[in-house]
Amino acid sequence: MSRTGSGPAWLTLFRIGNTLTGVIGVFLGAIVALGELPTGKLAVITTLQAISVLCFMASWNALNDIFDLEIDRINRPDRPLPSGSISVSSAKIVTSVMMVTSLICMLLAWFTVDSMGHEFSDWAPSLVIWIIALFLLANYEFPNSLRLKDRGLPGNIAISISVGLVAVFGAAGVLQPYNHRAWSLFLVGVFYNTSREVVKDIEDMEGDEGRNTLAMRVGADSARTTAWVLSLLALAAVIMPFAFEVFPPLHVVFTIPAVISLMLVKSKLLNSEDHEASSLLKKSMTLCLAAFLASSLIG
């Protein structure tokens, strides 16, 4: 196979499933904030910012594989870089191109906002969120940075904040950066994803020798306890927006499938079924976001 890589190899490197989730998150944030699908120029802005997120996340994921090359030779030898499907030099070039494309989309989004007669300050929160995400990326694993990836739980939280901010980014794009429903999505994303990141670190313990993940520092059992506590915080984040009438209280019934899935996580963790626990967390979060979306559209 060519060292420049085939299409499927690049999609694997970019973790296209995760990046598309980011795209959905932007639209979800916009829809939840507006209570309807964005139309006209708001739809253009949302699309541009969704493409920006796609390129940003693809760049982040590729960069993560570049820095994790030696670890992936043990944990994931089938990944594009350790398998040789894509050369490191090609990955670095495309990573840079994707990040530049993300920035260009942001500029185009601002030009669209400006054409609507709005001030820069109306859209500025979108740029602030993009810069925060860039800061987290730069300090996650770059040399001579905070190296959050090697700090255990803080690294998991950094990743999860970037995930949660996607929904707020979508709301900010339609000029509603302080929308309470969008920030409810943020909290759900942070707690669910942090719990899942901890569980994934438990799964990767064999290949993480020498890394300072939470699981490596405190052991698998203590890490599972932490993951469960974070899951309970996720449960609170699911229920509280209905209790405080951010969403109509009666619509809490929409969250029942998400809550049931979340409650099943505990037994998986107790039985050391870490992969199953991770899958349940992902399923529960998806069901929760679907519930929030349904509540917003129904009103």
Residue ranges with predicted function:
Residues 33-45, 129, 157-207, 221-238:
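Functional transmembrane core segments of multi-pass inner-membrane proteins
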Residues 2-4, 8, 145, 240-299:
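Extended hydrophobic alpha-helices typical of membrane-associated regions
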Residues 26-31, 98-107, 131-138, 231-240, ...:
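Hydrophobic core of alpha-helical transmembrane segments in multi-pass integral membrane proteins
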Residues 23-67, 102-107, 123-138, 178-199:
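Membrane-embedded alpha-helical segments that form the functional core of polytopic membrane enzymes
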Residues 3-12, 81-178:
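Intramembrane alpha-helical segments
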Residues 70, 136-149, 201, 264-272:
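C-terminal ends of transmembrane helices
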Residues 23-29, 154-171, 215-220, 279-295:
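Small-residue-rich segments of transmembrane alpha-helices in multi-pass membrane proteins
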Residues 52-103, 190-238, 242:
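Solvent-exposed interhelical
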